[in-house]
Amino acid sequence: MDQSKRYADLSLQEAALIAGGQHILCAYKMAPKDGLNYLEAAAHFAAESSTGTNVEVCTTDDFTRDVDALVYYVNEATEDMRIAYPLALFDRNITDGRFMLVSFLTLAVGNNQGMGDIKHAKMIDFYVPERVIQMFDGPAKDISDLWRILGRPVKDGGFIVGTIIKPKLGLRPEPFAQAAYQFWLGGDFIKNDEPQGNQVFSPIKKTLPLVYDALKRAQDETGQAKLFSMNITADDHFEMCARADFALETFGADADKLAFLVDGFVGGPGMVTTARRQYPNQYLHYHRGGHGMVTSPSSKRGYTALVLAKMSRLQGASGIHVGTMGHGKMEGAGDDRVMAYMIERDECQGPVYFQKWYGIKPTTPIVSGGMNALRLPGFFDNLGHGNIINTAGGGSYGHLDSPAAGAVSLRQAYECWKAGADPIEWAKEHREFARAFESFPQDADRLFAGWRDKLGVGA
């Protein structure tokens, strides 16, 4: 059935829709099944995403038609389709009237992902007006709160040197805490790897007190504050809160040094929002494990990593992983930096839409996945600043001298970039950074030809 007369209006102007502030706009790459009309398929997509179905129904009235989602732009050659969703379509909380991300996902990337006449459809960007931003929580804490704890300026406080306890599984409580202590002697921030939780060989109630003791000992030895991001992800929100409450009790007066990690893609929006609302005094660390099944460039359905990052800021993530922009082991490219810019700035041009955030707090780009000191200068060149958290597991625990030396090498890499120095020359005056060349020789060979001769290192 051709629904284009109802669910498409190509006379609508995007600028006018944005100025009106009464729609969420979504941009997709969409292709219909072979032989089908593009606009008809797009209109069916909009119908399925709002008030319609595959037939006319007798219960439709004039009010219903007023909240139809409308296709307002198509370009079949480039597979571009844009839809305007009236705000009235979206579900609101009965407790406080706020928007729910699950409603946005249900409509904008819900049933439409399995439609029989659609070959593929992937959301590449969306625009939310000021009213919608006001009706989401947004972050309660941001990187400035961590800089303050670390004794740094709260503006442009710089690189936070972090790690992930490795190996990701298999460490019992005492070795786990010792691994944390060894890194904290040189670094700032440790996160649980996302599978780490309450395994039978390392129960939280035994492990976490030992981790807190390691944090205090490292602080005493270095005279510097340390931070820990604890994984509270669980199927049951009561279990998640039980883990968080135990952690707060354990850390006591040092609770401000405790972040809560939620594996937000697998855990879902409800888990992220629960953590944000129940624990507004904690830095909310959004890990996105599993996202690649829909965000990967090889996937033509779902949504992009930039869309996920924008959603995380609306929900209130203090920080979210953004990959390594082609400099680590994970899939990505240099132009992924727009993802970082989108969540850290008050306004930013996305792939399609210019988004203003109207003063809500920023979300920190967290960089992780195969990074080490040798890869960081190039990463910073691409990003253009160092106001991030980097969690380098192998880059710390794979350093030949110690995890602490690995942490120091990461910091020295940032200082090298900030000084505009040549990494080889910098290494001659900074031992931990120099030893990173020997620790990661394959990266050294690829990035710094002739480094062995220049640093006097034998083959």
From Swiss-Prot:
UniProt keyword terms in alphabetical order: Calvin cycle, Carbon dioxide fixation, Lyase, Magnesium, Metal-binding, Monooxygenase, Oxidoreductase
InterPro entries associated with the record: RuBisCO, RuBisCo_large_chain_AS, RuBisCO_lsu_C, RuBisCO_lsu_C_sf, RuBisCO_lsu_fd_N, RuBisCO_lsu_N_sf, RuBisCO_lsuII
Cofactor: binding comment: Binds 1 Mg(2+) ion per subunit.
Superkingdom: Bacteria
Short name of one Pfam family: RuBisCO_large_N
GO function terms (MF aspect): magnesium ion binding; monooxygenase activity; ribulose-bisphosphate carboxylase activity
Chain positions with N6-carboxylysine modification: 191
Any GO BP: reductive pentose-phosphate cycle
Residue numbers annotated as active site: 166, 287
EC number: 4.1.1.39
Cofactor(s) for this UniProt protein: Mg(2+)
Catalytic activity: 2 (2R)-3-phosphoglycerate + 2 H(+) = D-ribulose 1,5-bisphosphate + CO2 + H2O; D-ribulose 1,5-bisphosphate + O2 = 2-phosphoglycolate + (2R)-3-phosphoglycerate + 2 H(+)
Extra facts: The basic functional RuBisCO is composed of a large chain homodimer in a 'head-to-tail' conformation. In contrast to form I RuBisCO, the form II RuBisCO are composed solely of large subunits.
Function per UniProt: RuBisCO catalyzes two reactions: the carboxylation of D-ribulose 1,5-bisphosphate, the primary event in carbon dioxide fixation, as well as the oxidative fragmentation of the pentose substrate. Both reactions occur simultaneously and in competition at the same active site.
PANTHER family per record: RIBULOSE BISPHOSPHATE CARBOXYLASE (PTHR42704), RIBULOSE BISPHOSPHATE CARBOXYLASE LARGE CHAIN (PTHR42704:SF17)
Family: Belongs to the RuBisCO large chain family. Type II subfamily.
Protein name per its UniProtKB record: Ribulose bisphosphate carboxylase
Annotated organism of origin: Albidiferax ferrireducens (strain ATCC BAA-621 / DSM 15236 / T118)
